[in-house]
Amino acid sequence: MHNNILIAGAGIGGLSAALGLARKGMRSIVLEKAPELGEIGAGIQLAPNAYHALDALGIGEVARQTGVHVDKLLWMDGMTDKEIASVPLANRFREFFGNPYAVIHRADFHGLLVEACHKTGLVEVRTNAEVVDYENFPDRVEAILHDGSCINGAVLVGADGLWSNVRQKVIGDGDPRVSGHTTYRSVIPAEDMPEELRWNMSTAWAGEGCHMVHYPLKGGKVFNLVLTSNSGASEPEAGVPVTTDEVFEKFKTMKRRPTSLIHKGNNWKRWVLCDRDPLPNWVDGRVTLLGDAAHPMMQYMAQGASMAIEDAVCLAFELGREMDPVSALKKYNRARFARTARVQTYSRYASDFIYHAKGGAAAMRNELMGGMTPTDFFQWINWLYGKETVEKYK
């Protein structure tokens, strides 16, 4: 029998898929290349659409309890130290969208998924098990691991991230696009955060060709710092240690308040961001893609994790109601492509128009965003944050 669903990758997308499948009564084997489970990075922003999907997976309440519910989304002009716009996230926001906006430590969130999967009794996770290839057969798919061993299943889901091995056979489109944007990350204790910036908000400082983001994590005990510049970098990097001086040099044109944070950070690390153009087909027979393997996106809409969780809910819905797995995967692909492509495209656009604008473009941004009321924002972003998408997958 080949009833197990095989999932390559035990990150947020892969475990969300396993949990969604378990809620439909389906067993899965999650194949993770790392020697142990874990997540790299600090913070994740969870908008209401992520929580709608987490509710469908049965862990919305525990995720709401674990996250930090920030009071506002705040955009500041880092060149003038003046507010561009803000959106309150309290009662009106929650009533409009049906869920909160929160930030959560990536490791804490991953831990919630691991625990939830374990409790189902239907999810097996194997480490040191990198999927490097696969073969489709009429009645099964065979996942081929790095050590040459093979595992058979009804379906293979490539949730193996930006540098997905599974994608290279499903689509074969080579390496991701190097964006030329470099991100620096650090986490600082709350007591080291300047009191004038110790805000319970997700704050973005927009500069010329750069921006800075900070928000609290772990119940406000630490602050996550994420700084991004249009560096023109042409080679991918991930987690390279760098000096504080290097970071300051990239952002020194901004005002004192935002740049004062740079010297509060320590153990700065550097990433060069990559994404891909939207492509409409993620399916090859009994194999499909999910999350960053399917639609990697820039960080500017803070939707990478959210889209992966939505993918998981949709995939479980289609596999749960369709006897033919090949047909189910095609329906999943069709259901998810337009939405994820829109977020990929908007994420690129937001970097130029909102976060890194210069001169007249920055002035236009300030005028347009500053003129929006909270209701204007709610209505504009409802296509993304609203319940309608996940409601289709129930």
Curated annotation (Swiss-Prot):
- Return the broad EC class: oxidoreductase
Domain of life of the organism encoding this protein? Bacteria
Q: Which reaction does it catalyse?
A: 3-hydroxybenzoate + NADH + O2 + H(+) = 2,5-dihydroxybenzoate + NAD(+) + H2O
Explain what induces or represses this protein's expression: Constitutively expressed. Up-regulated by aromatic substrates, the best one being 3-hydroxybenzoate.
Show the GO MF annotations. 3-hydroxybenzoate 6-monooxygenase activity; FAD binding
SUPFAM superfamilies hit by this protein? FAD-linked reductases, C-terminal domain (SSF54373), FAD/NAD(P)-binding domain (SSF51905)
Provide the cofactor list for this protein: FAD
List the thermal properties of the activity.
Answer: Optimum temperature is 25 degrees Celsius.
Name its GO BP terms in alphabetical order.
catabolic process
Gene3D superfamilies found in the cross-reference section: FAD/NAD(P)-binding domain
Activity regulation info: Inhibited by manganese, copper, mercury, and iron ions.
Activity's sensitivity to pH is recorded as: Optimum pH is 7.5.
Free-text function comment from the UniProt entry: Catalyzes the NAD- or NADP-dependent conversion of 3-hydroxybenzoate to gentisate. The affinity of the enzyme toward NAD is twice as high as for NADP. The enzyme shows higher specific activities against the intermediates in the degradation of 2,5-xylenol and 3,5-xylenol, 3-hydroxy-4-methylbenzoate and 3-hydroxy-5-methylbenzoate, respectively, than for 3-hydroxybenzoate. It also shows activity against 3-substituted benzoates.
Show the NCBIfam families listed in the entry: PRK08163.1 (NF006021)
Which protein, by its recorded name, is this? 3-hydroxybenzoate 6-hydroxylase 1
Its taxonomic path starts at:
Bacteria, Pseudomonadati, Pseudomonadota, Gammaproteobacteria, Pseudomonadales
What gene does the UniProt entry assign to this protein? xlnD
